[in-house]
Amino acid sequence: MGFAAILSASRASADSSGGLRACLHFAGQTLVEYQARQAVRAGADRIFIMVSVITPALSQAVDRLSADGIAVALVRDMVSMVRDAPRDVDALLMADGAIVSQAHVDSLGAAEGDTLLVADDSRASAPLERIDAGQRWAGLARISPALLFGTLDMIGDWDLALTLVRSAVQKGARRVTVPEADLLEGRAALVESQQQADLVAQAVASAGTTRAHARGGIEHYLFVPLARSAGSMLMRLQVPALQVRIGAMALAAIALVPIELAWVLTGFCLLLLALLLAESADRLDELALRRPPQGWTAFVPPGLALVGIVLAGGTTTAVDLALLSGVLMVADRWRRSGAAAPWMMLTPASVLILLLVAGALGLMGEGYRVAMLAAIASAAAVILRPRA
């Protein structure tokens, strides 16, 4: 059964701009958007964001989340929370400005009953809220409906998150302790400024994601590791994934020009660079906890690469190779490659590298024939290899 998530977006950041913590830039989006996506990935089916004032930045964040199919609502008072919060499922509570690794969010998402994520009292946990003499709240809690509505029935102007946590402590909620290494390495932090947000985002990028999108062919062995490094750098520079993807499309289109001018190897190199940029855009989406696109935007750079392969070959074999490679590309992107291992998948980048080597040796015609045989073998692996 799903659960609700309650986020907070009311505390000011420590920056001179005076903006909200929740609106700090984090992993290509606002911090509260990242929290919402974490909760959804852990199993939340609706998001409530407690606010004191609705700012344009918060409204835009809600619009972006809604566009991705996430049910989200801004809540300004306790009356609205009592009316809208579900009474039959638990709620995942996240502190204002808290960034916790996805593993901890998933753990509390799978927990049952009142549960607190805590850290032992130490210098590393000093920014966190103290809950007793020996521990502090690490910014994440699972709250039962009884505790939530018992607290909401109280009258007064108070901090909902902290009041819920204190009520959970008084009722003896189960505690999950965060290792001190997570605090030191940024996997559990309370972000108060943009500088802190950037540092924690670097830690998130270094740790990677637990559900990285699978790839086959040369993408798996070469492009994914390179995109991991490039994605971390682009995230630090706050470059949106959409801009990188558009750049990949533009570069792939430009690469067709030298191919038409008979500078085939130069065009192939540009196409490989375009495919690497597209993979980097996917990496940025993963870091932001967004699902990589599965529609036409995902297929423009590799599709143009296949067009380049046809233009360079100029034969029916080249057309057949591009068509079969296109089918394999869709199967790889949509995870319909069955039990085929990554090295069994012939992707557009794999074909380009094979043809680059053949072209450098003056054996371009033979390269197309070998690539066609490899495509047939790859299709056979997808169709015939026994599924687990």
Regions inferred by a protein language model and the residue ranges of each:
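N-terminal nucleotide-binding beta1-loop-alpha1 segment
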Residues: M1-G19, C23, A375-V382
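Short catalytic helix/loop segments, enriched in acidic residues and glycine
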Residues: A22-Q35
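Short, acidic, metal-binding catalytic loop of nucleotide-sugar glycosyltransferases
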Residues: Q38-A44
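Short phosphate-binding loop-to-helix
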Residues: S52-D106
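Conserved core of the sugar-phosphate nucleotidyltransferase
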Residues: P86-D88, A98-G172, L287-G308, A318-D320, ...
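Conserved alpha/beta core of the MobA/IspD/sugar-nucleotide pyrophosphorylase nucleotidyltransferase superfamily
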Residues: R136-M249
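Core alpha-helical transmembrane segments of integral membrane proteins
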Residues: G216-A298
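Generic detector of multi-pass transmembrane helix bundles and their immediately adjacent loops
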Residues: V300-A388
